Every structure is written in structure tokens, then in C-alpha cells.
Amino acid sequence: MSVNYAAGLSPYADKGKCGLPEIFDPPEELERKVWELARLVWQSSHVVFHTGAGISTASGIPDFRGPHGVWTMEERGLAPKFDTTFESARPTQTHMALVQLERVGLLRFLVSQNVDGLHVRSGFPRDKLAELHGNMFVEECAKCKTQYVRDTVVGTMGLKATGRLCTVAKARGLRACRGELRDTILDWEDSLPDRDLALADEASRNADLSITLGTSLQIRPSGNLPLATKRRGGRLVIVNLQPTKHDRHADLRIHGYVDEVMTRLMKHLGLEIPAWDGPHVLERALPPLPRPPTPKLEPKEESPTRINGSIPAGSCLEPCAQHNGSEPASPKRERPTSPAPNRPPKRVKAEAVPS
């Protein structure tokens, strides 16, 4: 549970702004905004989604800074509520909608701050996914960097040894690597994984549309990645119930439950949300399915650049690293703005934890 995850982190005073009031768009305005989102998705050639804890609350996993989030309740001296475990949590409508958007070629890359493993367990291809803060179900060999996707949480946090050894052999007949396996969960001051951050940065810079779902964008550098899309002339859509750090940069802001927004989006695009049939790991994306017929998305009078008084696409933005003293200190270490792209994919082995 995110409660146990949060409790396992080192003490850290500045967790950002917690418990901000939620905003709900009226039904007609919500429908109009989702219509605009569908038009943007269909007309864009390189769409990148960025997800946060808000997309998993419908599965019973609490978020962190929402009205009943883990850290919000902690600030109030109250115990957070939870309804499930990481192992028993099921992917939400949003998780499964993202799977289908990738299958038909409308989603090029997915960047996630979540550690709950639901993207991988939903069947989203790992070669199109960057998990910037780790995955509770994944451990990695410290020697050869092979990753193992388990069917239960690995049991440690903070890049610590899990007590298991790597079983991969470099070639037939050779002995196993036997390197020490470690969890992939970051603590506050740990550096983000180089490969995942490089891929996320490259995808964000190449995107002509970045869409954030269920994140307040307060954690750096993860929360600043969507701004790379804006600096390159792309558009930014923010879907969140609470105000976010980068609202002023958004071309379109949608205040509604993420599952409702994604369900309406899929309907406008003429796509079905697939049912989840149990956890399975997909290492590489399959050939894309045929796109559905072009939806009826004729232009409306009000463009997304004017909704909520947002700034037009292409306007000058401040650099990601520029912050004033009023913003929370960075819980994640800053990285160069242009890390080396096109790193080779990690070797991955999926198996159950030995009994």
C-alpha cells in the first residue's frame, strides 16, 4: 500500500503543498473540455502521457497530497485510510485506456511517478514506459542490470539488497551471474534511474502533446518534464482535481475524476477500454492495431488555448530549473536537461519469487 511505501521513506520535512481544495468542472464544461482533448489527441503525432498517484485512487490506493492523501493526513495527525494492498489492487479504467491508446498508436510514450506497478500489471509495454521512482514489484541486478518482475512486492525499499541473487547466464553453459539483487524504489535523496529519466526526457522533448493525469507536478525533475514539450512548441493538457504547479503553462486544464475523463475521451475517439484479465508482463510493444475511423471532431468556436485563460502554445516559458524561494525544495535530485538518449534497453527477466 502507498501507506507502507510512504512509511518506508526517510524523514523529509518538505513534501510540498498538501490538502489543497479540489475543483470540479460543471458537467457541460467537462464534456466540452474532453471533446477538445480528443481533438488534440487525434490531431497530434507524438502524444506522451505523464501519470501520478491520482490515477490509482480508484483501485483503493490512496494518493499523497489529496484531501485524504497519506501526507495530508499525516500533517493533520490522522491515520490515512486504505482499501487494498499492492498485490490485490486492480488497474483502473485509466490504466486500461492507456493500454488501448498505445495499442492503436495514439500514445507514443508513458512517464509515471507511481511505484504501485499497475502500469506493468495492466499489460502496458515496458519499452514504452519510464517508471521514474521505481516499481514495488521489480528488483535489479547490481552487476549486470538485469531486472526481474515479480508477482509480489520485493520486500525492501531504498535500492537495498533483497536477499536474492541474479540467475542469468551470459551464455549457454556459463555459470549464472549471481549478482546481488536490489529493489528499484527511490528514497527522497536518491538519483532517478539514468535510463528511465533519459527516455522520459527524450520523449517529452519530442512530444507535440503532453498530457498529465492525476499529478500535482510538485516533484522535480519528474514534474518539470511536461514543460519540455512546451519549450519545443508543443501543447500541454493537465487533468487534475487540485491546482498544479504548472497550471499557468497549460493549454487546457480539466478538473474531473481521471477515470471519468479517460472514459469520455475513449468514447469520443471511438475506442473501447479493454477489460483487465489478470497481471501479465509485456516487455516490448506489439505491432499497432489499426486506428478506428476518424471521429467527428469538427472545430468548435472556443479553442483549447482559451479555456481557463491559459496561455497559447508556443509562448515563452521559464526553464525547468528556474524556481523561486517560495517553492518546495526538490525531493528528487536535479539532472541535466538533455541526458543521453537512445540508451539500449535493459535486460529483463520475469518470474515469480522463489518459494
Curated annotation (Swiss-Prot):
PROSITE patterns hit by this protein: SIRTUIN
Sites of N-acetylserine modification: S2
Modified residues (Phosphothreonine): T294
PTM-bearing positions, type Phosphoserine: S10, S303, S330
Record note on disruption phenotype: Monkeys die soon after birth and exhibit severe prenatal developmental retardation. The molecular developmental stage of the monkeys mimics that of wild-type fetuses at 2-4 months of gestational age. Neuronal differentiation is strongly delayed, due to hyperacetylation of histone H3 at 'Lys-56' (H3K56ac), leading to up-regulation of the long non-coding RNA H19.
Residues in Deacetylase sirtuin-type domain copies: 27-272
UniProt note on regulation of activity: Compared to the defatty-acylase activity, the protein deacetylase activity is weak in vitro, and requires activation. The histone deacetylase activity is strongly activated upon binding to nucleosomes and chromatin in vivo. Two molecules of SIRT6 associate with the acidic patch of one nucleosome, while the C-terminal disordered region of SIRT6 associates with nucleosomal DNA, leading to efficient histone deacetylation. The protein-lysine deacetylase activity is also activated by long-chain free fatty-acids.
Catalytic residues of the enzyme: H133 (proton acceptor)
Native organism: Macaca fascicularis
Keyword check for 4Fe-4S: no
Underlying gene: SIRT6
Major localization listed first in the record, in broad terms: nucleus
Domain comment (free text): The C-terminal disordered region mediates non-specific DNA-binding.
CDD domains cross-referenced by the UniProt entry: SIRT7
Catalytic activities: N(6)-acetyl-L-lysyl-[protein] + NAD(+) + H2O = 2''-O-acetyl-ADP-D-ribose + nicotinamide + L-lysyl-[protein]; N(6)-tetradecanoyl-L-lysyl-[protein] + NAD(+) + H2O = 2''-O-tetradecanoyl-ADP-D-ribose + nicotinamide + L-lysyl-[protein]; N(6)-hexadecanoyl-L-lysyl-[protein] + NAD(+) + H2O = 2''-O-hexadecanoyl-ADP-D-ribose + nicotinamide + L-lysyl-[protein]; L-lysyl-[protein] + NAD(+) = N(6)-(ADP-D-ribosyl)-L-lysyl-[protein] + nicotinamide + H(+)
Glycyl lysine isopeptide (Lys-Gly) (interchain with G-Cter in ubiquitin) cross-link, chain position(s): K170
Lineage, top ranks: Eukaryota, Metazoa, Chordata, Craniata, Vertebrata
Assembly and interaction partners: Homodimer; binds to nucleosomes and DNA ends as a homodimer. Interacts with RELA; interferes with RELA binding to target DNA. Interacts with SMARCA5; promoting recruitment of SMARCA5/SNF2H to double-strand breaks (DSBs) sites. Interacts with the mTORC2 complex; preventing the ability of SIRT6 to deacetylate FOXO1. Interacts with the CLOCK-BMAL1 complex; recruited by the CLOCK-BMAL1 complex to regulate expression of clock-controlled genes. Interacts with CSNK2A2; preventing CSNK2A2 localization to the nucleus.
Keyword vocabulary terms for this entry: Acetylation, Acyltransferase, Chromatin regulator, Chromosome, Developmental protein, DNA damage, DNA repair, DNA-binding, Endoplasmic reticulum, Glycosyltransferase, Isopeptide bond, Metal-binding, NAD, Nucleotidyltransferase, Nucleus, Phosphoprotein, RNA-binding, Telomere, Transferase, Tumor suppressor, Ubl conjugation, Zinc
Protein name: NAD-dependent protein deacylase sirtuin-6
